[in-house]
């Protein structure tokens, strides 16, 4: 756990005195997907994870120490990096949702995909999510689903119902 005091669970959404509701729930910045091990351009192994806070992390796989952290999204209980990152050739790819419906965080939403250098945490490029919703109900730009990478492509299913391929 990298966010002290974050014990949010679904009971936090139930009105009244719900069982299992923590007294101080925290911001709901859990890790929605398993971490992945990747090698950086420096030859070192890194344990990588994406958090709903919108922050990507690299940990030392032996000690668990945080080596770097890079913000790529606003984050929130409906935002940040949701359900899967990917890595190849020294790069981490982080899909970000950042729903515009975020009562707890007034910062601007930053949905899209970011490529991050595994060894340094430096953002190499970012591609904002296309907003093709045109007012359709329940349609929001961004990426919640896990993405896939090949040596040349990033494959991503978007929350707006489109499948996108980035090269």
Across the structure, where does each feature detected by a protein language model lie?
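Extracytoplasmic/lumenal domain signature
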Residues: 1-31, 36-167
